[in-house]
A protein has these predicted regions:
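Catalytic histidine-centered segment of alpha/beta-hydrolase-like enzymes
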Residues: 49-50, 161-176
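Acidic catalytic loop of the alpha/beta-hydrolase fold
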Residues: 133-139, 163
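Catalytic histidine neighborhood in serine/cysteine hydrolases
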Residues: 33-38, 148-167
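Gly/Ala-rich beta-loop-alpha elbow adjacent to hydrolase catalytic centers
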Residues: 83-94
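Short beta-strand/loop motif that positions the catalytic acidic residue
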Residues: 123-124, 129-131, 135
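A conserved short beta-strand
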Residues: 101-113
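Serine-hydrolase catalytic machinery in alpha/beta-hydrolase-like enzymes
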Residues: 2-77
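Conserved alpha/beta-hydrolase fold motif
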Residues: 80-83, 106
Length: 189
């Protein structure tokens, strides 16, 4: 039996039991990822939006917490490793995998531009991304799609969706969530 692990890394103010990471993890479980680790870190920096210094400090603090949380996992004992991440969690996940040389795949929910700063060349064929056109954390949807395309990462753009990939229409959100999870499942298989 092949051992498969999924690691979930949330964003600030978004925990692993919210829709994208919860259902992403459940989809992975249905495909054979029976073990999972939710990374639950605490934002000790406060409001970081629009402040590059605070954003960097938050990343460093959250990354340090992630190192501590994941330190006892022997990643070499798994046949397949999947990182499901959201927002700043996408930066932490890609950086962690890169620094620890973990052969894995990534599902990037609402990545930020910094997600691609140090690792985009290494994600081709090993990642998928989802972004919304009304995401206030992204200056330009085109910038995200461009970075993904240059890195060979399929990117799915959800019209009118915010940083949680939600719109003002609850029924549209449910349809979008189903579509996002189906695309996630296709990538994981």
């Amino acid at each position: 039996m092949k051992l498969k692990l999924v690691v979930c890394l949330p964003g600030i103010g978004y925990h692993c039991d919210k829709a994208l990471l919860y259902y992403g993890r459940r989809v992975a479980e249905s495909i054979g990822y029976k073990e999972y680790k939710n990374v639950e870190y605490v934002n000790r920096i406060g409001n970081v939006k629009g402040d590059p210094v605070k954003m960097q400090a938050a990343f460093e603090d959250l990354y340090g917490q992630t190192e501590e949380i994941l330190k006892d996992i022997d990643f070499s004992g798994y046949d397949s490793i999947l990182f499901l991440s959201k927002s700043v969690g996408t930066i932490i996940a890609t950086t962690y995998a890169e620094r620890h040389k973990i052969p894995c795949r990534h599902v990037l929910y609402t990545p930020l531009e910094a997600t691609f700063d140090n690792c985009s060349d290494n994600l081709s064929g090993r990642a998928i991304a989802f972004t919304g056109t009304a995401d206030p954390w992204v200056e330009s949807t085109a910038a995200i799609t461009d970075r993904c395309q240059k890195a060979g990462i399929p990117v799915h753009v959800i019209e009118e969706a915010n940083h949680s990939l939600e719109t003002a229409d609850v029924w549209k959100n449910l349809k979008n969530l189903e579509k996002i999870m189906m695309q996630t499942a296709e990538f994981i298989k």
